């Protein structure tokens, strides 16, 4: 029986967050067996629209839109790139403290929007925010 130890999903698990049909039929229908056997650690995308179904169907560590978890000698940090990641934001402060406290050999951070984009729309200046973050990237 080959199965993943866990599933990381970078958001947009559905196309229209308020549409319950999409959660039930288009996500959980096809993924039922996989999700039943493996832990699922998503990050929220823009298509979920911060809808209550996301928080109802996924049981995530508080505050749910950003969190961390460990697997082996790795720690994973999940942030919501739909919300502010500026140095004075709640998420940034949490990530800064969490990275400093982490004893994991490997540290991974994931989110929905790309860090860099090949076009002029870099999704809310994500790349500029990352450049300002400085050593958060190197911890």
Regions found by a protein language model. Name each.
Residues 1, 11-13, 46-47, 81-82, ...:
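Active-site metal-binding loops of divalent metal-dependent hydrolases
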Residues 1-21, 117-118:
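N-terminal active-site segment of His-dependent metallophosphoesterases
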Residues 7, 107-109:
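Receiver (REC) domain switch-region micro-motif
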Residues 21-107, 121-139:
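Extended active-site neighborhood of metal-dependent phosphoesterases/phosphodiesterases
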């Amino acid at each position: 029986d080959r199965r993943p130890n866990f599933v990381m999903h970078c958001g947009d698990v559905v196309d229209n967050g308020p549409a319950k049909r999409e959660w039930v039929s288009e996500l959980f229908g096809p993924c039922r067996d996989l999700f039943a056997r493996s832990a699922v650690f998503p990050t929220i995308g823009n298509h979920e629209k911060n809808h209550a179904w996301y928080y109802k169907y996924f049981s995530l560590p508080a505050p749910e839109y950003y969190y961390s978890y460990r697997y082996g000698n790795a720690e994973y940090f999940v942030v919501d790139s739909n919300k502010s990641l500026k140095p004075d934001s709640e998420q940034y402060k949490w990530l800064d403290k969490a990275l400093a406290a982490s004893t994991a050999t490997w540290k991974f951070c994931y989110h929905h929007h790309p860090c860099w984009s090949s076009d002029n729309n870099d999704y809310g200046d994500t790349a500029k925010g990352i450049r300002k973050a400085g050593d958060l990237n190197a911890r």
